[in-house]
Regions:
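Core catalytic lobe of class I
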Residues: 1-284
């Protein structure tokens, strides 16, 4: 993996090594070669209007501490904290030029996944329809989870939306056989052979958030689970193919690509994100 910073960024980037780039992503997108990527996955800021906080915690067993799994007690100690604003006056004005360039960077068989929440998903879909054409809309994926604050004044929002667009609706790559299958909800209705094989996930994905004590936990705010991103990379890229995330955050796409024999380019302007991703990816 090669680390680049904005002050040393060339006008044209070649895809020789995996790249982790600390820079304005629009400048990087202009420097990348066109039609080079099997897959672009982005998880842009959700425009929540607040601040996202990164907390690094140490968790230790403690008799009489907070009840945890199996009734065992534990204590959490905050080691460090950093945050960033998640608030844009003109969210689409910020995102649209990046989406237009993303389309140009996709190979003819390439696919774009845009990870959003309920605040902006419908606006971004209309913009993507304008940029790609409605015929290039492939899927709306729902990642459902049960975590976070509850409210009694409305239905609690417990899902994210992932919009999927292809460069060419007649030529895009989708390998359903490469995706881990999941159990049937009623296996007795499908026969033993199909029940043993499992089924291809539908457009609604039930998947936990990153576990507090999980090996992949970085403490970075908005970190997405490797299991969710692994489905995307497995289905929509080929071994050895190039994948891009220009809102890289904690580097989950890079971690998954390293596991699945894909190449990656990760971009983020936040030094804290680059530090987390670098620590996660060094040596992979």
């Amino acid at each position: 993996m090669r680390l680049l910073a904005e002050d040393g960024l060339p006008d044209r980037l070649s895809l020789d090594d995996d790249l982790l780039i600390e820079a304005d992503n629009l400048r990087v997108l202009d420097a990348l070669p066109a039609a080079a990527f099997d897959l672009i996955y982005i998880d842009p800021p959700f425009n929540t209007g607040g601040r996202q906080t990164r907390r690094t915690l140490e968790v230790e067993p403690l008799v009489g501490g907070t009840p945890g799994f199996g009734g065992r007690g534990y204590a959490r100690t905050e080691v460090s904290r950093s945050d960033y604003a998640d608030d844009f006056d003109d969210y689409l004005g910020f995102l649209a030029p990046r989406l237009r360039r993303a389309r140009e960077l996709l190979a003819v068989h390439g696919t774009l996944y845009v990870h959003l929440d309920y605040r902006e998903a419908h606006y971004v879909k209309l913009e993507l329809d304008r940029i790609f054409g409605r015929e290039c809309f492939l899927n709306e994926l729902i990642w459902a989870y049960d975590y976070g604050a509850k409210t009694k004044r409305r239905w609690p929002a417990k899902h994210d939306t992932i919009l999927v667009y292809v460069r060419d609706p007649g030529r895009y790559w989708f390998d359903s056989d490469a995706v881990d299958r999941e159990p049937y909800m009623a296996p007795g209705l499908v026969g033993p052979e199909k029940a043993a094989r499992g089924k291809l996930p539908t457009s609604v994905w039930w998947h936990t958030i990153v576990p507090t004590n999980g090996a992949e936990k970085t403490g970075y705010p908005t970190q997405k689970p490797e299991g969710v991103v692994r489905r995307i990379v497995s289905a929509s890229s080929r071994p050895g193919g190039w994948c891009l995330d220009f809102f890289a955050g904690s580097g989950t796409l890079g971690a998954v690509c390293a596991q699945l024999d894909r190449r990656y380019v990760l971009v983020d302007s936040n030094p804290a994100a680059i530090a987390v991703a670098r620590a996660r990816l060094d040596g992979r």
